[in-house]
Amino acid sequence: MQTKLGRLTAVLGIFPMAVLCASTLGCSRSPARSVDRFYGIVNSPAADGKLVSIDVRNQNDVTITPIGAIGTFGCTSVALSREGTLYSICGPGNFADTQHKYGCMTPGPQQLATIDPKTGHATMFGAPVEKLNVMALEFAPDGTLYAVGDANPASPTFNTLYTVDQKTGAFTAVGSTGAPPPNFFMDLAFDTRGTMYGASMFGLFTIDRKTGTATKVVDFVGGGVVMGLGYNAKQDKLYATDWKTPKSALYVVDTKNGFLTPMADIGYPLSHGLVALMP
């Protein structure tokens, strides 16, 4: 692993076809194409988690740039407003870290947060929410902020869709997704047609924004433990990241058969949350 010009550069052992390039000219000799940028959080949910940018030029040219430490425990989501502000939900939630692996000893509340895209630092604000263990957060094309919460399979509100007031942090229930355990939603994404996608660790769903009802699309094939989902409108492609050690990976998602095509090794473990930076 080397750094060059402030960028993280690596030759990927698990995906030989993918190289994390440090040069803005790219790794190949082909003409440079426009960059599709994503933001994600790695080493999540630890307080020393980092915001990273992921620049995709093609399947052989992916650049991962560490931006900075989040500085707050439990920031597992990332969403981008139309105004260009990055949001997350931070705090222990209902996460019981019995082995003290992530520095969280007891469950606690979560709050909406903004993330500085230059430093990675998260600032929590607004009304705290209890026992929702929110992982999934995303803005709709009309600017509405959505989240899915309540990870308790025994709860009558398990896997419920919410709208979130981005000024106060207040949650308003839309309705239960109806997706059964273990399909708790880890991330959300919208395509250009306004379709809301939800990813559990094991499969892809669509979610009705008016009722909250989720419909299974397909199981993921060729990967699993998906916890990041992002849509790139320029390429009309759905991307995903997984939550694993020692290194997470970036994939392209085939929405017809669920196949996950590997794009790159992210270079960090435990990636959670993915959002596209639109031009």
Explain the meaning of each model-derived region:
Residues 44-48, 92-98, 102-106, 151-156, ...:
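Short glycine/acidic-enriched loop and turn motifs that connect beta-strands
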Residues 65-71, 125-130, 174-181, 218-222, ...:
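Surface loop/turn motifs at the tips and blade-to-blade linkers of beta-strand repeat domains
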Residues 71-81, 131-139, 181-189, 223-233, ...:
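Repeated scaffold domains used in trafficking and secretory/extracellular systems
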Residues 37-42, 85-88, 144-147, 195-198, ...:
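Conserved beta-propeller blade signature
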Residues 30-67:
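An edge-strand/N-cap motif at the start of beta-rich repeat modules
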Residues 55-59, 115-120, 165-169, 208-213, ...:
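Short loop/turn segments that connect beta-strands within beta-propeller blades
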